[in-house]
């Protein structure tokens, strides 16, 4: 279970991105984060995995407060957090199988990770995961030969290879067509239910969020202004969340809120 208690983020400029955000995500529940540009959705995800240090509050993953741990313990805890990225974050020249196995880098000795010699158990599990996401036949294909939807499936398998206690998903369908977007969202929902995983999904597509999320949390100016079932998301609630912004065409968070090296930083920390 993930629990956020009065999580706050204020930057050195004085700008407050998150204002005492409190919410709990039980095991097996998939929560969608919605809101206008600059609402704090990406900042919230970056605070949870500590790519950004929160200014206050607690981040409880099980009985561990991620906001309070030191660097060494944080590296260990990041193994428990699976990340699925909009940009896929695959190593293009490596095979699909090698990319999935990279999710195990934080669990093997340095010499094994350097030579990419993984235990048999990890390899067998990677094959099972590729079968689950529908890519078993592509195990030996290079990542750069895959379609966008296939690359995202590899990203899902890699995150699951970590055997995480939490999934953080950052706009997984922003680069995909509508049909593939539905397939990816359905897959994320299914694997979380199968593994009893809590998940938070930053999603800009409101109708897609209403269709697939167990629960929706609406952010506006860094505050939670809605927390409830998708069926409760009516025009009045949407106006509260989005204000004057057209929610039907709401785009991604602005560039300043997501640093370009975030993906590499997370994967590097997991692999240490």
Swiss-Prot record:
Highest taxon listed in the record's lineage: Bacteria
Localization per record: Cell inner membrane
Reported function: Part of the ABC transporter complex PhnCDE involved in phosphonates import. Responsible for energy coupling to the transport system.
Annotated spans, Disordered: 248-272
Gene3D superfamilies to which the protein is assigned, alphabetical: P-loop containing nucleotide triphosphate hydrolases
Catalysed reactions listed for this entry: phosphonate(out) + ATP + H2O = phosphonate(in) + ADP + phosphate + H(+)
Protein name: Phosphonates import ATP-binding protein PhnC
Family statement: Belongs to the ABC transporter superfamily. Phosphonates importer (TC 3.A.1.9.1) family.
The enzyme's E.C. designation: 7.3.2.2
Basic and acidic residues bias (residue ranges): 254-272
Enzymatic class: translocase
A single cellular component GO annotation: plasma membrane
InterPro entries: AAA+_ATPase (IPR003593), ABC_transporter-like_ATP-bd (IPR003439), ABC_transporter-like_CS (IPR017871), ABC_transpr_PhnC (IPR012693), MetN_ABC_transporter-like (IPR050086), P-loop_NTPase (IPR027417)
Keyword vocabulary terms for this entry: ATP-binding, Cell inner membrane, Cell membrane, Membrane, Nucleotide-binding, Phosphonate transport, Translocase, Transport
Pfam families: ABC_tran
Domain ABC transporter, chain residue ranges per copy: 2-246
CDD domains: ABC_PhnC_transporter (cd03256)
Subunit note: The complex is composed of two ATP-binding proteins (PhnC), two transmembrane proteins (PhnE) and a solute-binding protein (PhnD).
Binding site for ATP: 35-42
Membrane topology category: Peripheral membrane protein
């Amino acid at each position: 279970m993930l629990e956020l208690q009065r999580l706050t983020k204020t930057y050195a400029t004085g700008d407050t991105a998150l204002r005492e955000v409190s919410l709990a995500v039980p095991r097996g529940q998939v929560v969608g984060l919605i809101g206008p540009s600059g609402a704090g959705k990406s900042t919230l995800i970056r605070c949870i995995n500590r790519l950004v240090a929160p200014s206050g509050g607690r981040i409880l993953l099980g009985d561990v407060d991620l906001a309070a741990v030191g660097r060494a313990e944080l590296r260990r805890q990041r193994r428990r957090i699976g990340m699925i990225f909009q940009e896929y974050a695959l190593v293009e020249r490596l095979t699909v199988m090698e990319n999935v196995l990279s999710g195990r880098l934080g669990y093997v000795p340095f010499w094994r990770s350097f030579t990419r010699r993984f235990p048999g158990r990890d390899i067998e599990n990677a094959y099972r995961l590729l079968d689950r996401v529908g890519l078993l036949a592509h195990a030996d294909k290079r990542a750069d030969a895959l379609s966008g939807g296939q690359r995202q499936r590899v990203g899902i398998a890699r995150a699951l290879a970590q055997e995480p206690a939490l999934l953080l998903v950052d706009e997984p369908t922003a680069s995909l067509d509508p049909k593939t977007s539905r397939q990816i969202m359905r897959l994320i929902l299914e694997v979380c239910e199968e593994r009893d995983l809590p998940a938070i999904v930053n999603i800009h597509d409101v109708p897609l969020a209403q269709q697939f999320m167990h629960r929706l949390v609406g952010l506006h100016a860094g505050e939670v202004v809605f927390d409830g079932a998708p069926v409760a998301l009516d025009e009045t609630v949407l106006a509260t969340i989005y204000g004057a912004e057209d929610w039907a065409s709401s785009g991604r968070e602005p560039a300043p809120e997501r640093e370009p090296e975030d993906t590499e930083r997370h994967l590097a920390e997991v692999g240490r």
